[in-house]
Every structure is written in structure tokens, then in C-alpha cells.
């Protein structure tokens, strides 16, 4: 009788341990990370307007319906990235995410000076090379080195009312996401 109870307890304990390990390993084996998911909107190093959020079918979880959003996927192995945009007077923000969708850098209209966004994203090695001969075109740019190889940039503009939608859409559609300095 005692032996049977020990076997049952051992089986339940082993089953619980295996279950917990599998649950923690799922993200490592999931093929659809955030970076891969952003690839469905279009080619890398170009901003793509995200569709308006619909309940249960948001392109990015937790999207605000009063924000217009554009995404640019990148791989710094192909060179540094430069993000440039003339943004509306209302609130805007730019955020850089790693492959898994973790925010590694963000900036908004209050932290930046004016409505012109000029952001250069590099790896530490690219930053060291850039310091040896910095181009004059980066004089007014915000230059950041990030500990990531690939990720995506999310550019958001607040739409306080529908009359602001055309200007915000024009601003995000005109945003540039390339490797040219």
C-alpha cells in the first residue's frame, strides 16, 4: 500500500516537473517571434502602415485605436539603420524592439526636440567604426548603439480626432527607414 502511494506521488511530481519545463521552453521553440510576425507587413528597412486594430485581431497586442502606427523591420547585420520622419504636432513616439518584442529603446515628442525625428541605430562594433570617421549628416541625429542584431521600429502618432488622420497618415507614410547616412 505504501509503495503504491509512493509510486503515485512520484508520478504526479515527475509529471508536474515535466509540465513546468515544457511550458517554460515553449517560447524558445516558437517559430513565430515578434520579428517574424512583423515580416508579414512587407520588406525590411521600409515603414509599413499597420491596419486599424480590430478586437481580437490586432497586428500588435494592446494597440490603441487612437494611435496610427507604422512598423519597420531591420537586421543590423546588413548595416546600421537610420529612421527619419517629420511628425505631426500632436503626441508621437518611436520604440525599438528586439526579435522577441521586448522594448530596448524609446523616444517621444517631449524627449526629442521638435517634430523632426532623426535616429541612427547601430551595434557596438558599428558605433566604434562610426566614431573613427563620423559623417556630417549625423550631426543632429540621435545615435544609439543597441545590444541587438535584429528587431523592429514602431512609429506611433496620436490622432485626437478624425480631422487629424490625413496629416498623421501623411507623416507616417513619409517616414524613412534605411541604412543611408
Sequence positions of predicted segments:
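A compositional/structural signature for long, glycine/proline-rich flexible linkers
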Residues: 1-181
